[in-house]
Design a protein with these regions (language model features):
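Cytosolic ends of transmembrane helices, especially the final helix of ABC transmembrane type-1 domains
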Residues: 4-31
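Flexible, glycine-biased helix-capping/connector loops in cytosolic signal-transduction modules
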Residues: 6, 34-37, 178
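Conserved E/DxxT/N motif and adjacent residues on the DHp alpha2 helix
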Residues: 30, 37, 149
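ABC-type nucleotide-binding domain
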Residues: 40, 47-299
Length: 299
């Protein structure tokens, strides 16, 4: 009798599990069936302006009656340049770079890539030219190799190693007995925060993008590793136009151009030296991270 009761309980649990599974499956299917509100353009980028990004009085307002998240942003990033973006929490740094691959569309002004408004470009081709490394490093269950190949499926062994070297991640592979075939747990649970970030950056570099967006993606790296990473990206034969979003002045001080954001507006732009002399917000950020007497423009 007790055995029958046990089996009935198992059967009841199975029914509950199946009911939940069907409900989850329906929700997933509704996501797959959802139509994007964005439309893809048909124009193609100008090949002579490879990687050039321009904002013309661009801004975005979330929702119909929402507050402006970004307003009046104008700057030009030429091919191969590095643009640093710095500001406090909620200042609009991530929102700004998310306009480039059209994760959001500007509600005012224009964002141009290679001389063409991103809304007029073929969306698939636009995103093929861009690699984004988000704030949270995302790794999947598998191996180091399988995670890197998400960047480009047909990447060769040499290309994988080259990307790892630039991302300062080769030592991770060399420290594993299985090398590139070493196990990676879901979410990179068996790796440190810095290791996860470096592997995620390597995956982006394998795409050989024209535009590279590092959205506070080196926050777990020490200053020396961060500096080597930036130098290695700049030394590539065809360096991408790189956007470095950071709250650390040390990570963006050597950028070709720096944007300082405060409450969704650009309150200063220029080189590190210029901003240190003329931009109060940048001065405050810099002096809060370094002693005042240390800003003798050491290169």
């Amino acid at each position: 009798m007790s055995q029958i009761l046990v089996e009935l309980i198992k059967f009841a649990n199975l029914i509950i599990t199946m009911t939940k599974a069907v409900a989850c499956g329906n929700r997933i299917q509704s996501v797959f069936a959802m139509q994007s509100s964005q439309t893809s353009g048909s124009r193609h980028p100008e090949e002579t302006l490879r990687g050039q990004v321009e904002f013309r009085n661009a801004g975005i307002t979330y929702g119909v009656a929402g507050a402006e998240a970004l307003s009046g942003v104008s700057f030009l990033a030429r091919s191969g340049q590095t643009v640093g973006i710095i500001g406090g929490t909620g200042s609009g740094k991530s929102t700004l770079v998310n306009l480039i691959p059209r994760f959001y569309d500007a509600t005012q002004g224009q964002v141009l890539v290679d001389g063409v408004d991103v809304r007029e470009l073929n969306l698939e081709e636009l995103r093929r030219r861009i690699a984004v490394v988000p704030q949270k490093a995302v790794l999947f269950r598998g191996t180091i190799r399988s995670n890197l190949l998400w960047g480009r499926e047909d990447a060769t062994e040499e290309e994988l190693q080259a990307a790892l070297t630039v991302a300062q991640a080769m030592e991770i592979v060399q420290g594993k007995d299985q090398g590139l075939d070493a196990e990676v747990q879901q979410g990179g649970g068996n790796l440190s925060g810095g290791q996860r970030q470096r592997l995620t950056i390597a995956r982006a570099l394998i795409r050989q993008p024209e535009i590279l967006i590092l959205d506070d993606s080196a926050s777990a790296l020490d200053y020396a590793t961060d500096a080597r990473l930036r130098a290695a990206i700049g030394a590539l034969p065809n360096p991408p136009t790189t956007f470095v979003v950071s709250q650390r002045a040390a990570s963006i001080r050597h950028a070709d151009w720096i944007l300082v954001l405060d409450d969704g507006r650009v309150v200063g732009q220029g080189t590190h030296e210029t901003l240190l002399e003329q931009c109060p917000v940048y001065q405050e950020i810099y002096h809060s991270q370094f002693r005042k007497e240390a800003h003798s423009h050491v290169s």
